[in-house]
């Protein structure tokens, strides 16, 4: 990515900005440099991006020393996952981000190898309840997110489902993901109606989505 284009992506708030923030810290930009270019993004967020870029460099360095997914130690896997890296990103970084692309990673070095190692180490995400009232008062909702956590002591509440509470059949609805500005919400609308139809039939509906700002992920859906 040319430097001038990176600067443009930092200055203009579009869907490219998050990738641009990460790339800027990869290239050694300081917190203040990035803050000035973005017009004042809160330092708290910038520090998180800077940290992720530093950890990515650590993963890549480990790969340069010959580490393969099968050699990842438990504390390393927990830390990398807790910092927000996907299994695919870890595999790609260990391989040095080859120009051929992550799809061409060889067996034993690909995403599946990292996932297999993570399962072997019994490292899985936790389910945490979303505080829909921002700590203003206690709230219990059937609204959860997954996390591996890292760095700071958790104040979240783990969700441990009691599958014996209900004998109803459970059906999972896969959400449509992020919705861009200008795009219709018909896919999300369809998910909500699918949930309603499942409930009308007497079953339990579980929706899995990765868009916290849309109707299908509202706590009362």
For the regions a language model picked out, list residue spans one by one.
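ATP-dependent carboxylate/acyl-activation modules
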Residues: 1-221
């Amino acid at each position: 990515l040319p430097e001038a284009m990176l600067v443009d992506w930092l200055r203009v708030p579009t869907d490219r900005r998050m990738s641009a923030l990460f790339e800027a810290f990869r290239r050694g930009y300081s917190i203040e440099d990035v803050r000035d270019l973005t017009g004042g993004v809160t330092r708290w967020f910038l520090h998180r991006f800077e940290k992720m870029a530093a950890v990515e460099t650590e993963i890549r360095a480990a790969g340069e020393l010959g580490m393969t997914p099968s050699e990842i130690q438990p504390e390393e896997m927990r830390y990398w996952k807790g910092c927000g890296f996907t299994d695919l990103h870890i595999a790609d970084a260990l391989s040095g981000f080859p120009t051929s692309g992550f799809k061409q990673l060889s067996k034993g070095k690909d995403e599946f190898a990292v996932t297999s190692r993570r399962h072997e180490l019994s490292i899985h995400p936790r389910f945490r309840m979303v505080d829909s009232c921002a700590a203003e008062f206690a709230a219990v909702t059937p609204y959860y997110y997954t996390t591996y956590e890292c760095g700071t002591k958790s104040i979240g509440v783990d969700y441990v489902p009691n599958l014996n509470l209900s004998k109803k059949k459970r059906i999972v609805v896969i959400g449509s993901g992020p919705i861009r500005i200008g795009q219709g919400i018909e896919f999300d609308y369809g998910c909500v109606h699918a949930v309603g139809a499942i409930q009308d039939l007497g079953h339990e509906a579980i929706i899995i989505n990765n868009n916290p700002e849309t109707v299908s992920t509202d706590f009362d859906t």
